[in-house]
Amino acid sequence: MPKLKVKKGDMVLVIAGKDKDKKGKIVQVLPKENRVVVEGVNIVKRHTRPNPKLPQGGIVEKEAPIHVSNVMVICPSCGKPTRVGKKFLADGKKIRVCKKCGESLDR
């Protein structure tokens, strides 16, 4: 299974599906399922029973995971959606880089 090139906190652009062209921050990464949860994207309605957390129950809207192939990382320096590359620093540390401008994506 290939390693995911996105991390929690990355800004991404949705490139396919019902929420195409929406931007959002990654809230959660699910590496075993190759999916990510993006803030404000793929909102679904869940019908919940009354429970201690939600005493009245009802319909709750929440974000559902989308496949990682449907999102592209937005480079913080050039602001464009880009593919992610890897680069080794002089001290042997591996970082993620923007394929368009070559700048680091890691904070």
Curated annotation (Swiss-Prot):
Q: Which keywords annotate this record?
A: Ribonucleoprotein, Ribosomal protein, RNA-binding, rRNA-binding
GO CC terms, sorted: ribonucleoprotein complex; ribosome
Which SUPFAM superfamilies does the record cross-reference, listed alphabetically? Answer: Translation proteins SH3-like domain
Instruction: Report the domain of life of the source organism.
Output: Bacteria
Q: What does this protein do?
A: One of two assembly initiator proteins, it binds directly to the 5'-end of the 23S rRNA, where it nucleates assembly of the 50S subunit. One of the proteins that surrounds the polypeptide exit tunnel on the outside of the subunit.
Entry-linked NCBIfam families: rplX_bact
Can you say what this protein is called?
Answer: Large ribosomal subunit protein uL24
Per the UniProt entry, what species is this protein from, by scientific name? Carboxydothermus hydrogenoformans (strain ATCC BAA-161 / DSM 6008 / Z-2901)
